[in-house]
A protein has these predicted regions:
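Short N-terminal "domain-start" leader segments
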Residues: 1-8
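Short, surface-exposed beta-strand/loop "edge" segments at domain boundaries and coil↔beta transitions
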Residues: 14-26, 118-122, 289-290, 360-361, ...
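Extracellular beta-strand-rich solenoid/capping regions of secreted or surface-exposed proteins
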Residues: 40, 57-87, 96-130, 138-160, ...
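Acidic glycine-/aspartate-rich tracts in secreted/extracellular proteins
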Residues: 53-54, 90-93
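Short glycine/acidic-rich loop motifs that flank beta-strands on beta-rich extracellular proteins
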Residues: 59-60, 97-101, 138-146, 151, ...
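Right-handed parallel beta-helix
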Residues: 120-222
Length: 387
């Protein structure tokens, strides 16, 4: 039995701790005070079970993310300075929903916020979140302002370790679905994201920002600005290995690896053919591999928006045994380095491409690949070698 339970009975939502009722509210009412009382009652390292039902929240709790008291966010469910394990009745069964009108210009919102109290305080050493749908009701929010960094349905911050996020759904977000961030305090280590679905998120469906030794598996993202975003930091050249993996991912949106060292992707199914402004599989700086994957975009879009890949700055990428289809296939610009082994590439604009409006010093090495369409579109200053 969980330490604290939340459930719906008759017309009421009820919270109990140790078998004793600690809070109640109308099912049709605002659940934010009841959930805060329930979370406060969970002991450190304890458990909270949320029963079947729809729970609707305002976002009244103001929380500054930066140490100087700036970067103010508003949230519905604050989980501060506490490691715990939260379990719902399952995706589509337990639904946590943002009430209408919570997000508006200048008012940045996260439905659930998990982190240390002050700017650089340590976060949890163990945390679990399972079996819940997060509903952002974005059609009932003010979307006049572009998504702000960190906004979303779940925002996790602070230097922390051993978080597990599985069997979750994030839908209709005004910004990100789930955002495992850091707010400058350091990485999340040994984080696991498994069996998560993101739908119709205005920013990233699934974001891992400055993570180490972490994994994403068996996840999907549909109708998001970016399906999966693995983010690093400007110190990538001296940071060492991040060791972040992603496998068995399905998405119709761009996938981005940004200043991440030692990323490893496999069994990716990315088809951006219907995305309005996708660059396909994008890598900036850092290094890593993608294997046994399908990377597709719209070959009729005669620009980088139709490209299956886009590697720039000082990215170093190995593609192995991938099916690549788009206007451009392997597209490497800036000072990037791309090596393609045993790939099947279809690209009318160039299976191997280094063209860019800016000067390039990029390199593409091809080995054992097949090409349908234009084989090479090379810009002066770049290098192409076939082995």
């Amino acid at each position: 039995m969980a330490d604290v339970e939340i459930y719906q009975s008759g017309s009421l939502t009820i919270a109990k701790a140790g078998g004793q009722q600690i809070a109640a509210c109308q099912i049709q009412g605002n659940a934010r005070a009841l959930f805060k009382a329930a979370i406060d009652a969970v002991p450190s390292g304890g458990s909270l079970n949320i029963g079947k039902g729809r729970y609707v929240f305002s976002a009244p709790y103001a929380f500054p993310l930066d140490p100087d008291g700036s970067n103010l966010f508003y949230c519905s469910i604050p989980i501060i300075d506490k490691g715990m394990h939260i379990t719902g009745a399952g995706v589509g069964q337990t639904i946590l929903q943002l009430a209408p009108g919570q997000r508006r210009e200048g008012r940045h919102v996260a439905l659930m916020l998990v982190r240390g109290k002050r700017g650089f305080d340590l976060g949890y050493s163990s945390f679990g979140l399972r079996g819940i749908t997060f509903e952002g009701a974005s059609s009932q929010q003010n979307l006049s302002e572009q998504p702000y960094d960190g906004e979303g349905l779940l925002l996790v911050g602070s230097q922390r370790s051993n978080g597990i996020f599985e069997n979750l759904e994030f839908r209709n977000s005004h910004a990100a679905g789930m955002y495992l961030g850091n707010n400058g305090s350091g990485p999340g280590t040994n984080e696991t994201v498994r069996n998560v679905i993101a739908r119709n998120c205005a920013a990233e469906g699934i974001m891992l920002d400055t993570n180490k030794g972490s994994s994403v598996s068996d996840c999907q993202a549909w109708g998001c600005r970016v399906g999966l975003f693995l983010n690093g930091n400007d110190d990538w050249q001296k940071r060492g290995s991040d060791n972040v993996t992603a496998t068995r991912i399905k998405t119709d949106s761009q996938i981005t690896c940004w200043q991440v060292n030692d990323f490893s992707l496999s069994q990716i199914e990315m088809d951006c053919s219907k995305a309005a402004s996708s660059y396909g599989f994008v890598v900036r700086d850092g290094n890593g591999t993608i294997k046994n994957s399908v990377l597709k975009s719209d070959p009729t879009k005669a620009s980088s928006y139709g490209g299956a890949t886009y590697f720039y700055e000082q990215a170093r990428v190995l593609l192995e045994a991938c099916q690549i289809e788009g206007y451009f296939g392997v597209h490497a610009v800036g000072k990037s380095y791309a090596e393609a082994k045993d790939c099947n590439i279809t690209a009318p604009g160039g299976c191997f491409c280094t063209t860019d409006p800016n000067p390039v010093q990029s390199t593409i090495i091809a080995q054992g690949c097949t090409c349908s369409g234009l084989k090479k579109a090379l810009q002066s200053g770049s290098t192409f070698e076939e082995r």
